Amino acid sequence: MLYLYLAVGGFCGAVGRYFLASFINRLWPGSFPLATWIINLGGCLAMGFILTYTLERLVMGPELRLGLTTGMLGAFTTFSTFSVETLHLLQGEKIPLALLYLFASLAGGLICMQTGIFLARLPLSSKALSSIITREDGEE
């Protein structure tokens, strides 16, 4: 069953990355690899949030967690594309842009991961909490 979770997550992540990258590249064409940068940072934010939330607050089986993180987010984000795009910038003698991409990706990834962890640990609002613990018939 674990392999099914990984396969479904991987499929969803890869297809999601393809469509989102295509959309971003149509909106903002240019020499800076914005689509990969946005996708990778979004994946770091989601990874920090999902891992923290499912380990600290939400009861979730390890197979589903692995399908969401390793499967979906692993396929959604892409270190290999980041590496190829950085190499193309260097080969095209766009060294300042390549260095910006490297720094923005590494620092941004760490910041987004920590932000996801922070968001997952925010206390639930009293209204949201009361709606969770109040039964359908209105009794607590």
Curated annotation (Swiss-Prot):
Signal peptide coordinates: none
Domain of life (superkingdom): Bacteria
Listed transmembrane segments: 4-24, 32-52, 70-90, 99-119
Entries under Pfam families matching the protein: CRCB
GO cellular component: plasma membrane
Keyword 4Fe-4S (UniProt): no
Localisation: Cell membrane
Keywords: Cell membrane, Ion channel, Ion transport, Membrane, Metal-binding, Sodium, Transmembrane, Transmembrane helix, Transport
Record text on activity regulation: Na(+) is not transported, but it plays an essential structural role and its presence is essential for fluoride channel function.
Catalytic activity from the UniProt record: fluoride(in) = fluoride(out)
Membrane topology: Multi-pass membrane protein
Gene Ontology biological-process entries: cellular detoxification of fluoride
Binding site residues for Na(+): G74, T77
Keyword Cell membrane: yes
InterPro entries documented for this protein: FluC (IPR003691)
Principal place of residence: membrane
An example molecular function term from Gene Ontology annotations: fluoride channel activity
UniProt cross-references to HAMAP family, sorted A to Z: FluC
The protein's role, per its UniProt record: Fluoride-specific ion channel. Important for reducing fluoride concentration in the cell, thus reducing its toxicity.
Family the entry assigns: Belongs to the fluoride channel Fluc/FEX (TC 1.A.43) family.
Protein name: Fluoride-specific ion channel FluC 1
